[in-house]
Curated annotation (Swiss-Prot):
The gene is ME53. Residues 20-42 are annotated as: Disordered. This is Early 53 kDa protein. It comes from the Viruses. A zinc finger (C4-type) spans 374-394. GO terms for molecular function: DNA binding; zinc ion binding. Keywords: DNA-binding, Early protein, Metal-binding, Zinc, Zinc-finger. It holds the Pfam family Baculo_ME53.
Amino acid sequence: MNWFKENNIFDNKLAKKPAASKLGASPTASRPAGSPAPRRVKPLNKSELAHAAIVKRIGRGSDRLNEISASFVPPEYGFRFDEVPACSHKLEYACERDLREHFLSDNEREAMKSLLRFATNYVLGYINSKDMLTFGRAAGLKLKNELEYVQESECTMCGYKFKDNTRVWMLYVIVRHPPRAASADEEFVPSPNTPDCFEFACCDCADNYPDQLNSHQVYPGINSLHAQRLVEAGFFYQYVFPLEYKTEYFTYNDVKIVHHEGPFKIIQRLLREYKRPNEHIVSITLRTTGGVVLKEINHNVRLMRYRNIYKEPTASDDVNCFTVSSSSELMKALDSGAFDSIQGTVFAEIYGFAIQEFVTGVITFPVRPVKGNYCAVCKKNKMYYSNPVLCCSKCGFTNRYIFNGKYDDLYFHPEAVQTHATHSTHGEFVRYYNLKLHAKICRERLEEYEAQNLQ
């Protein structure tokens, strides 16, 4: 299956987005309507209802008693915005602003958003499997109307129960690297598929951990550099399949802009017309015949639970928002009016890298295995007939470590995820990966690829 991954033939439709050779007139971008905070006279939405039910079930401590976090906006406050669309997160949003959040690939954005959602629940004291399905790429899968599997969360280093709600609302992921081999001739190749490689740590344990370079904050925010390191370490999976991070660098030279409408419109249109979903932009350089006039570099993008963690947000745009703290050459050019005198042709250079594999499934995380976490349907070996069980509504997501890397080389196809409804009293669902359907999809994609090459 490695040949399929290297050639990326399965994601042909996404990868073949045509790149424009010349920037023409852009469609008029209208300013979307604002997204004010929903008033509390309205009924609670699904996320708030689920949180309230889980808090009651696990007995979470009151926020009012957590004095150390009194100055922070509570993690659960943002749930009220889950059904309110945000405006500024979209590339086409008309307001002039820093566009570097859109330099990230869709893979990175999906991974960061999934991790922040998971971390938000984790800090609140639980892991909500239905929430992971709802906010992941699980379209078409049947869900129970009520809660599915819920697991209490804890610091895997000291055992602190986050539901106790007595420590600061922060969460870290620590990557434990195995010790070096005793002899240089006997190099040890670390495997990410072992339960002790990752720790979900409270702030106290993370602060005292000696290897700070491998300690990554994931709540109240996560930055893109840490997300990349976690991907490389094997932290992110799609169900029980690794999310790989193989990259290939590229440069688009001398993209010609004959009639420009200022630096913001130029970069916005370059991102819209040249950047593919699986591409990460490192820098965009604009120049004239006289030399470079602007170079926007993507240093580090951060995804925050709240734009200001000390002030309650009033709009959905300030919840789960991407921010960039480093200075922006684009914003400097807008403030100074540097492009006002440039009337001729502007040339653009785009430098970045493409990620070969796309995020097409629900992203899961290396939670420690729970002993006896199986039922009569998903069984101890987590197999539905000859197919691996991915998620059970009663027992949650199948722990990646159960299969001991057996399916690590399979290229994940979302079409092969299927649901079996049990006949139990509570109407449980088992989601499994149909290996026969997987093989059929592989054959069809390969035949399609070969046919295209013969033309």
